[in-house]
């Protein structure tokens, strides 16, 4: 599949809403696409989607998670404002004034709090989520309850934009990037491998924990998005944009298989596919579940460097996106 087609697929995926536990929109898109292309799939009770392509799919499995970080409605005030809680890891200080969509009714809202110029000095410290509210334009609790209920998921509202020198801005690039790469490979119908689209990664890799006991891949690759530190200032080294996909050594949930990592690094270098090492060990991903079941599966993590991840304006490079596809394609050929 050509890069322009993959970028269009990524655009379509990022415009879908799927916080952890509410992955239906992405799952339905995948199921519709797979069905239209006569690609068999399975879906387990937790919503994970498994595709086993070709005659020997257990050679290698590729993983990507469908969910994104977001929020849930935890209360409705008497004045019609919504109280909310995070779903996944979200930083409080990026939220004020961001537009959101609430629930299946797609109610528009804005995250707000007391304006800075009206706050007393004692309130000048960073505002936390419990002190914020979502304004949906309701005049009362009764008015708000006509379209919103406690427990409704809340999503960021953000356009997909190509800008600058080959950059992409969107919400949910973590991990619609991985989903787009794997789906693109499936649609070629050229390769034998297992594809796994997992749920609930952002709240403790729950989907991967459930799906792995029924799989038996000889090797695995988790496709992800990670932080990058390529802007001016004193930042912890992580990855750099436009320098290729990042290969993890270890993180907070797993240690990558050394021999598998060495193979990946060598073959990427041989084929002139840009690759770098991820220098930070923070965070975790589905590899934390994939590595340690079925007697142990040699697992590697390939991550795309992303600026401002877990926000409505995450940014990636088109060339890095292409590098991930090319390397994943090479691995399912050569593993």
Stretches with model-predicted labels:
Residues 1-335:
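N-terminal hydrophobic/helix-forming segments and targeting peptides
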